[in-house]
């Protein structure tokens, strides 16, 4: 399958590598708004690049991994230039119908993972959630996803919105809490690395226990002495509010 990559960020860097490794596809080109990004990914994938939408070459499938705001502006021009192609976006929070009225064949290819350009991942372990505008296209998208992942799921736009919301809680907010922890430790000269065994064990536990059953800490028993003492140690008002709200939420839901 001839594939054009629209975008050259964290997700596309990892997906591009996975598609190339699958040996069943030809990455015909990388497009990005910035030459530096397009050139860097194209070099990794040994394929041409462009920054001009009018110069995007013919492909069977175009996979779009760009900011949500950019997606809506790219679709009209890209679909007009390549009316017979299949178009897939990779956004967890965008509806499939963003293509409606522009493309004949379209769908969603959403790999749910946190990606960084310089951090290798095993793409076969990453769940990919797919959707398409008809059954024939859905079969193509499923087969494409199966070449890079062992966990392919069909999900509607409505379901995917909630999946993405859950991912924000499980990943983005959790990582922000790591950052807050690092900011607490730094003035005391304590390296963040001491937290890693705790973080790893917390993640391991939910492989065997539900998150509800795995919850520990002063908020479980609502130990107000500890909670109030720790809140008083926090200088930043926003961080203090986060501590208070999370403690209350833990207590209320147990």
Predicted regions and their residues:
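Short active-site oxyanion
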Residues: 1, 26-29, 59-62, 83-87, ...
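NAD(P)+-binding Rossmann beta1-loop-alpha1 motif at the extreme N-terminus of oxidoreductases
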Residues: 1-51
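Short, well-ordered alpha-helices that flank and scaffold nucleotide-derived cofactor binding pockets
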Residues: 13, 17-21, 43, 76, ...
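Rossmann-like NAD(P)(H) cofactor-binding subdomain of soluble oxidoreductases
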Residues: 35-40, 44-120
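Internal alpha-helical scaffold of NAD(P)-dependent oxidoreductase catalytic cores
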Residues: 37-44, 120-162, 170-207
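Interdomain hinge/lid region at the active-site interface
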Residues: 186, 200-254
């Amino acid at each position: 399958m001839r594939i054009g990559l629209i975008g050259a960020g964290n997700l596309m860097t990892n997906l591009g590598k996975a598609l190339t490794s699958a040996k069943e596809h030809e990455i015909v080109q990388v497009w990005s708004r910035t030459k530096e990004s397009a050139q860097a990914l194209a070099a990794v994938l040994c394929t041409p690049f462009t920054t001009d939408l009018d110069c995007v070459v013919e492909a069977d499938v175009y996979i779009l991994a760009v900011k949500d705001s950019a997606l809506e502006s790219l679709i009209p021009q890209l679909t007009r230039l390549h009316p017979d192609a299949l178009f897939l976006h990779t956004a967890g929070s965008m509806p499939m119908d963003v293509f409606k009225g522009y493309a004949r064949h379209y769908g969603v290819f959403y790999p749910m993972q946190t990606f960084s350009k310089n951090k290798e991942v095993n793409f076969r372990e990453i769940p990919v959630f797919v959707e398409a505008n008809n059954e024939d296209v859905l079969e193509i998208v499923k087969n494409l996803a199966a070449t890079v992942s062992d966990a392919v799921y069909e999900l509607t736009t409505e379901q995917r919105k909630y999946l993405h919301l859950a991912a924000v809680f499980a990943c983005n907010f959790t990582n922000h809490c790591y950052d807050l922890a690092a900011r607490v430790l730094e003035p005391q000269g304590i390296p963040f690395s001491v937290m890693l065994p705790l973080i790893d064990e917390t993640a391991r536990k939910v492989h065997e226990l539900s998150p509800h059953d795995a919850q520990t800490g002063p908020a479980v028993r609502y130990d107000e002495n500890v909670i109030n003492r720790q809140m008083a140690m926090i200088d930043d008002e926003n961080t203090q509010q986060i501590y208070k709200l999370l403690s209350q939420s833990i207590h209320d839901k147990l």
